Amino acid sequence: MTIRLHIRPMKWKGACAYVDEHHRHHDPPQGHQFSLGVLTESGLLVGVAIVGRPVSRVFDNGLTIEVTRCATDGTPNACSALYAAAWRTARSAGYRRAITYTQDGESGASLRAAGWRKVADLPARPGWHAPSRPRRPRGTENVARALWEITTHNAPPLPELRDETRDETRPPRRRCAARPCRHLVPATGTGRPARYCSQACRQRAYRNRKTPQP
């Protein structure tokens, strides 16, 4: 027998509590634009979707929204109902693209059933931890993902899918070792990291090393 499902708005705390209890590999996100719940006819909550700004800055253009969490108790068609409702809500608010990700090994059947399409397979990434912004491991590091989208007819082209590593995860820029310069040293693509910002600083440092100290 097919279970009839209904969509309703969810408050932030309630959606996060459901994700915390039912999501397989993610904690609740840090924020949202809106959240939705899916209920049976008896009023039992069987799933939630949390929708917010895109995590990747490549997509954060004001016209794109991301389903950052979708969690259910396994009720048939609950996921596809949430993805479809998330897009209806976003489109009515003026968004032209919605995106989400699945992990390697997930079929995406619920997304296809809701009209979404897979647009890219993304390689595994090491995670978001950085010295300037510590993040605890979440168990999702080094897992390949797939990017999915659904769009309006007038959506802008999909942006270039460059490396999604954030700036704070990149190695810190060095400062010139020649005193008293201390300018930032240009980054090198390969080889040993540069120590000096210019040839003049390199020569000055060499002379200082060779000059006998009083």
Language model segments and positions:
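A broadly conserved sequence feature marking short terminus-proximal activation segments
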Residues: T151-R170
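Conserved beta-hairpin
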Residues: V19, H32-A49
